[in-house]
Amino acid sequence: LKLQKRLAASYLKCGKGKVWLDPNEVSEISMANSRQNIRKLVKDGFIIKKPHKIHSRSRCKK
């Protein structure tokens, strides 16, 4: 799944750590070996870009 994660990261314009692959669809994702297939999986919702983590500013504001 390394290749799929790398392709998805480049398509979603984010890092590999931000890419979430659906654990229930591992067989489907592992068959995808092109950018076109990755694009289809993103559209279907099997591959998602994780949201940004927001760091609390409460300690800075004190």
From Swiss-Prot:
It comes from the Eukaryota. PANTHER family: 60S RIBOSOMAL PROTEIN L19 (PTHR10722). This is Large ribosomal subunit protein eL19. The keyword Ribosomal protein applies. SMART domains: Ribosomal_L19e. Keywords: Ribonucleoprotein, Ribosomal protein. Signal peptide: none annotated. One of its GO terms (cellular component) is cytosolic large ribosomal subunit. InterPro entries: 60S_ribosomal_eL19_sf (IPR035970), Ribosomal_eL19 (IPR039547), Ribosomal_eL19_CS (IPR023638), Ribosomal_eL19_dom (IPR000196), Ribosomal_eL19_dom1 (IPR015972). Belongs to the eukaryotic ribosomal protein eL19 family. GO terms for molecular function: RNA binding; structural constituent of ribosome. The keyword Heme does not apply. The gene is RPL19. It comes from Zea mays (Maize). GO terms for biological process: translation. It holds the Pfam family Ribosomal_L19e.
